[in-house]
């Protein structure tokens, strides 16, 4: 919105700010780019850790990366079957 008003008033954004914004967009894109293998490994690691505390439906577990203009978010949908009363490490 401010950028629109600045343009209407004839003020151009400083080249420093334009370069900074472009770099930010490149970094966000890089962070969101993840190989299917790495995403699968992340999913397996989440299952290992969470399974120490609760019984989960591994088949219905969903892990995704979402990005908007400013950030990348890890979204995990993990159906819980039941909580474990005692902590136990499998393996």
UniProtKB/Swiss-Prot annotation:
Signal peptide from the UniProt entry: none
The yes or no answer to whether the keyword Cell cycle is present is yes
Which Gene3D superfamilies does this chain map to?
Cell division topological specificity factor MinE
Q: A Pfam family for this UniProt protein?
A: MinE
Q: Does the keyword tRNA-binding apply?
A: no
The biological process GO terms on file are: cell division; regulation of division septum assembly
The domain of life for this entry's organism is Bacteria
UniProt cross-references to SUPFAM superfamilies, sorted A to Z: Cell division protein MinE topological specificity domain (SSF55229)
**UniProt keywords, alphabetically:** Cell cycle, Cell division
NCBIfam families assigned to the protein according to its UniProt record, in alphabetical order: minE
Q: What does this protein do?
A: Prevents the cell division inhibition by proteins MinC and MinD at internal division sites while permitting inhibition at polar sites. This ensures cell division at the proper site by restricting the formation of a division septum at the midpoint of the long axis of the cell.
Q: Which HAMAP family match?
A: MinE (MF_00262)
Similarity field: Belongs to the MinE family.
Q: Which protein is depicted?
A: Cell division topological specificity factor
